[in-house]
Regions:
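Short alpha-helix
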Residues: 162-178
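A short glycine-rich, Lys/Arg-flanked "PGG" loop and its adjoining helix->strand segment in the class I
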Residues: 124-136
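Core SAM-dependent methyltransferase catalytic element
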Residues: 186-209
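Conserved class I S-adenosyl-L-methionine
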Residues: 1-43, 56-60, 79, 83, ...
Length: 209
């Protein structure tokens, strides 16, 4: 579970930026649509956008899921959800912490975690919670529409192997939390790691602690 201070810090950062977020980063729309297509959710399935912000992938997910599917968009910042609603983004919306999701075990087919992990005080706990709600074989994308270098520069930092999305740290965390990394795109235009949910009965052979 994120602490109150961690949630507050996230809200303080995003709330004043919510109203013009999509305008400032309008060039990212196709990248969100592309990662939604890569995740390839099943027709009629359930997609979770954890830390959805303004839910920029929701329309692409709805197109893939068809009329019987469902996109669930959760964020801790009300202002971002309000901006998503004003933009007419589809799906259901709710305020929820990605480390304490109001969802049943093994209820979700696909998860998008876009820009999420760097804002969690305990990213490993977040990945474990995402694994809890995902069906065996379900897929997760840890995604940023810009490179790690550009993301660090946006926050006046330089990339480090200690960063939550640095492959040297992220890949072991994924394995330890019930995911099997399938692909890594640590490129100049985006960051995207896609992983599959390991069936719980197989975890004993992967995780030793």
């Amino acid at each position: 579970m994120s602490t109150v201070s961690e949630r507050k810090a996230t809200q303080v950062f995003f709330a004043p930026r919510a109203a013009d977020w999509d305008t400032r980063f309008a060039g990212d729309d196709e990248k969100y649509a592309a990662v939604a297509r890569e995740l390839n959710p099943p027709v009629g399935g359930i997609v979770l956008d954890a830390g959805c912000g303004t839910a920029r992938a929701s329309a692409a997910f709805v197109d893939a899921l068809g009329p019987t599917g469902c996109v669930v968009n959760f964020d801790v910042t009300v202002e971002m959800l309000t901006a998503a609603s004003r933009a007419g983004r589809p799906g259901s919306f709710g305020v929820a912490d990605a480390t304490e999701l109001p969802l049943r075990d093994a209820s979700v087919d696909v998860i998008l975690a876009a820009g999420l992990l760097p804002h969690l005080g305990d990213p490993l706990a977040g990945l474990r919670e995402l694994a809890r709600v995902t069906k065996p074989g379900g897929r997760l994308a840890v995604f940023h529409p810009i490179s790690r270098v550009a993301l660090a520069a946006r926050h006046a930092q330089v990339p480090s192997d200690d960063d939550a999305i640095a492959p040297a740290r992220l890949l072991p965390m994924l394995t330890a939390s019930g995911w099997e990394p399938a692909s890594v795109d640590d490129g100049v235009d985006r960051f995207c790691v896609i992983a599959s949910r390991v069936p719980p009965e197989k975890m004993s052979g992967i995780v030793t602690a």
